[in-house]
């Protein structure tokens, strides 16, 4: 019997099994759209970044002016730059919603998929930070100085590590060159990890809103979810383009439109909005090493979720108390983002410390609350 080429060709069949004939649960909701949206965001960032790299100069004397040149002189360069900068914000917004969906529906029980996802999150945050340094404005320079200086908290090796990353005794030309190099290569590593992430996901199959085994109720990915994803792409691009044209510099720091000056410190040093929750947690710990550990743990704690899982049913949709706790956690993370942008003074310091305790307590209380609810059902 004749088989279509998509099933017989050694290369096309791989794409076919991942995008066309892939068996998918029939009831997955719009929350499952964010995976494909993240792939779209990554493609957008790689393409815009590639064209920006053609005109960018990774040198402290010319970096700021080269960004200025891209926006003023390069044909549609302003659009590329704003697409790349705001695309990063939208990338992180989708990333946080993707992780939030994984926590809510307990998709972390697919251990390998979850672990690669957390590694991707770490790498994406590193890439975002490196990109923030490249325009070489005031916030770029001081952000790079402050964040890289955190490594000096590592016992014995601290200062050696910092100087190794700087390539000297201060943030200088060498630092900018290597940051640009890593910022360029990391998205391709993320792309490779994304393939591994999908490979692990397709071995187990997707989770679904009911948290049940859906092997008896699978439908082909194409056309059902291809069209659903395309609709998601259209909505995403519409929001992004509207945002770019109306609020193009809203998410950027005004300080970064001033060339870097090592002799003048900005009043308030802060990273981009998508790091502010972690930055607030870092500042909440009075000890430097403790702050760095808390900063890493704010993301790494996601890795313990598969091991603390204690509920009989899969997903918080069956646990009303856990739902309240989850949405409380969303509010806490949002407030931490706000606190991270505030100056280090009362009442913000105390508020940040309370929110940090609430953030980490979620991961302790959640499994206990699920166990309590299961006990009530018995």
Swiss-Prot record:
Residues given in the record as heme b b566 binding sites: 98, 197
GO molecular function: metal ion binding; ubiquinol-cytochrome-c reductase activity
Membrane-spanning segments: 34-54, 78-99, 114-134, 179-199, 227-247, 289-309, 321-341, 348-368
CDD domains referenced in this protein's UniProt entry, alphabetically: cytochrome_b_C (cd00290), Cytochrome_b_N (cd00284)
Topology of the protein relative to the lipid bilayer: Multi-pass membrane protein
Residues bound to heme b b562: 84, 183
Record's subcellular location: Mitochondrion inner membrane
Binding site for a ubiquinone: 202
Cofactor note: Binds 2 heme b groups non-covalently.
Entry keywords, A to Z: Electron transport, Heme, Iron, Membrane, Metal-binding, Mitochondrion, Mitochondrion inner membrane, Respiratory chain, Transmembrane, Transmembrane helix, Transport, Ubiquinone
Domain of life: Eukaryota
Chief place of localization: mitochondrion
The keyword tRNA-binding appears for this protein: no
GO biological process: mitochondrial electron transport, ubiquinol to cytochrome c
PROSITE patterns the record matches: CYTB_CTER, CYTB_NTER
CC per GO annotation: mitochondrial inner membrane; respiratory chain complex III
Cofactor(s) required for function per UniProt: heme b
Family to which this protein belongs: Belongs to the cytochrome b family.
UniProt xrefs under PANTHER family: CYTOCHROME B
Subunit structure: The main subunits of complex b-c1 are: cytochrome b, cytochrome c1 and the Rieske protein.
Additional record remark: Heme 1 (or BL or b562) is low-potential and absorbs at about 562 nm, and heme 2 (or BH or b566) is high-potential and absorbs at about 566 nm.
Known role: Component of the ubiquinol-cytochrome c reductase complex (complex III or cytochrome b-c1 complex) that is part of the mitochondrial respiratory chain. The b-c1 complex mediates electron transfer from ubiquinol to cytochrome c. Contributes to the generation of a proton gradient across the mitochondrial membrane that is then used for ATP synthesis.
Descriptive protein name: Cytochrome b
Protein species of origin: Anopheles quadrimaculatus
């Amino acid at each position: 019997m004749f088989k279509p080429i998509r099933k017989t060709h050694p290369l096309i069949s791989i794409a076919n099994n991942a995008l066309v004939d892939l068996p998918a649960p029939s009831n997955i909701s719009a929350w499952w759209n964010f995976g494909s949206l993240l792939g779209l965001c990554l493609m957008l960032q790689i393409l815009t970044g590639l064209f920006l790299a053609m005109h960018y100069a990774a040198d402290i004397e010319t970096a700021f002016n080269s960004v200025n040149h891209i926006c003023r002189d390069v044909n549609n360069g302003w659009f590329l730059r704003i697409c790349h900068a705001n695309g990063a914000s939208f990338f992180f917004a989708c990333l946080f919603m993707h992780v939030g969906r994984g926590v809510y529906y307990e998709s972390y029980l697919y251990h390998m998929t979850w672990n690669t996802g957390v590694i991707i999150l770490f790498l994406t945050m590193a890439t975002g930070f490196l990109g923030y340094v490249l325009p070489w404005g005031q916030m770029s320079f001081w952000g790079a100085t402050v964040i890289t200086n955190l490594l000096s908290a590592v016992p014995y090796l601290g200062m050696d590590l910092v100087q190794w990353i700087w390539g000297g005794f201060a943030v200088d030309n060498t630092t900018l060159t290597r940051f640009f190099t890593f910022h360029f290569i990391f998205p391709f590593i993320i792309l490779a990890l994304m393939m591994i992430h999908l490979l692990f996901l397709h071995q187990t199959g997707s989770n679904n809103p009911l948290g049940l085994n859906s092997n008896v109720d699978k439908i082909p990915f194409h056309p059902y979810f291809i069209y659903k994803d395309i609709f998601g792409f259209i909505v995403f691009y519409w929001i992004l383009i509207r945002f770019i044209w109306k609020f193009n510099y809203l998410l950027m720091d005004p300080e970064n439109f001033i060339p870097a000056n090592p002799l003048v410190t900005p009043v308030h040093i802060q990273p981009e909005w998508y790091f502010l929750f972690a930055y607030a947690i870092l500042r909440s710990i009075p000890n430097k090493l403790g702050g760095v550990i808390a900063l890493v743990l704010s993301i790494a704690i996601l890795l313990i979720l598969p091991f603390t899982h204690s509920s009989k049913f899969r997903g918080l949709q069956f646990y009303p108390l856990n739902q309240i706790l989850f949405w409380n956690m969303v509010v806490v993370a949002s407030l931490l983002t706000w606190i991270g942008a505030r100056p280090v003074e009362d009442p913000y310091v105390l508020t940040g410390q309370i929110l940090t305790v609430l953030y980490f307590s979620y991961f302790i209380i959640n499994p206990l609350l699920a166990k309590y609810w299961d006990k009530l059902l018995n």
